[in-house]
Structure formats: C-alpha cells, structure tokens
C-alpha cells in the first residue's frame, strides 16, 4: 500500500471533529417573574458551564440590562424589573461572545486574566491573548 492510499485510508477512518457549537452550549435561561423581579432560576448551572465567577457574570448582566441584581440563598439571580427570557438569553450570548469564546480560534477554552488593570482573554487552546469584552 502506497503513501497516498495510506493517507486516504487514515482520513476516512479519522472521526470528524465537532465544531464549537456542538461542544459548547449554554443552558437556556429559565426565568420567571416574582413580584417586580425576574428570577433567573438556572443561573448556577449557567455559571458552571461558562466557568466564570458569578459576580463577573452578574455585573455584566446588570450593565447589559440596566438594572440591579443579587444572588439569593438558592443561587438564583434576582434581577430588579421584568425581563423576558429572550432578552436575558441575548445578554448571556453577548457575555459568551465577549468573555468566553476565543476571537482567534472560536473555542471556549479561555481564562480571564488581569493585565495592567485590563481584563484579557487568554486562550488555552491556541495561546491567543485578546482584550476581553470585545
């Protein structure tokens, strides 16, 4: 068997590598109204999936939604005001784009670091360093 035949055989037997969408997904926000507050029921599973500090994500959501928030004793995020599920999901997706997904390789294997007072996204997959939140 020649080189070309071996190469063709190897490529046929190699499984396809799944893209980032299949490998990384964030749970859809489970939100409900409770009085004048919106309760993000599955905030903790979302934080676990994002692998970020809950205070960082909460602060981002506060800024993005223009409201105040706190985390209750059950780990749920309580947002002051009424927000639809689609709006909270949009804000979470914006967070993922700016603070989780590497802008160079598109993988979620990143860490937030402080560098000279600025937040930097460091990718553990490709080694890229880029400003966070862009």
UniProtKB/Swiss-Prot annotation:
Keywords: Initiation factor, Protein biosynthesis. One of its GO terms (molecular function) is translation initiation factor activity. Residues 1-12 have a biased composition (Basic and acidic residues). The keyword Protein biosynthesis applies. Residues 1-32 are annotated as: Disordered. Heterotrimer composed of an alpha, a beta and a gamma chain. PANTHER family: EUKARYOTIC TRANSLATION INITIATION FACTOR, EUKARYOTIC TRANSLATION INITIATION FACTOR 2 SUBUNIT 2. Belongs to the eIF-2-beta/eIF-5 family. eIF-2 functions in the early steps of protein synthesis by forming a ternary complex with GTP and initiator tRNA. This is Translation initiation factor 2 subunit beta. It comes from Natronomonas pharaonis (strain ATCC 35678 / DSM 2160 / CIP 103997 / JCM 8858 / NBRC 14720 / NCIMB 2260 / Gabara) (Halobacterium pharaonis).
